[in-house]
């Protein structure tokens, strides 16, 4: 899966983390980013949360964030999220735990745009496996770990006990596809 639809995005939010995510009132809340600072009208600086690890034990750093944005901004990727981040011109690494996002012009809605679930992938693992193999057995830093996928039947996730925001109360989640729109809930 490339996470190019809303149902896939819901699965993605469980397995991966984002810089910001909307709360129940649709207000962007920091996740992997701790905060932001406007350097100038087109440059936003984000310190990243330290101590976050991917499910394979690899620490999450600015390199992973930049890789994930660069991938999503590449027109060849054809990601579902591109329209939300198309105002981004460049992502720069300042240090291991700080990035800058440079936009094409002033973008007062950038935090809202970042809250539409641009997932952060482990750069080295993604490059090593390639997109197709990575998405068959995804590794994220989110509250749930990928366990298995049976095509047209189910995706199984288990709680990430080492999640930076506390282990989920639910220990196992099963996503089942419902092909008929009329029967979806």
Residue spans of the language-model regions?
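Sec-exported extracytoplasmic/periplasmic mature domains
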Residues: 20, 24, 41, 53, ...
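Surface-exposed binding/hinge segments that line
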Residues: 37, 82-125, 148-150
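Gly/Pro-rich hinge or "lid" segments in bacterial periplasmic/extracellular proteins
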Residues: 23, 27, 115-168, 172, ...
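Short, hydrophobic alpha-helical packing/hinge segments within bilobed ligand-binding/sensory domains
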Residues: 68, 184-185
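A local structural motif
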Residues: 44, 99-101, 165-176
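A structural "hinge/loop" feature
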Residues: 1-9, 32, 58, 80, ...
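N-terminal lobe/hinge region of extracytoplasmic solute-binding protein
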Residues: 1-40, 70, 139-140
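Aromatic- and charge-enriched surface segment that lines or borders ligand/interaction sites
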Residues: 34-78, 94, 100
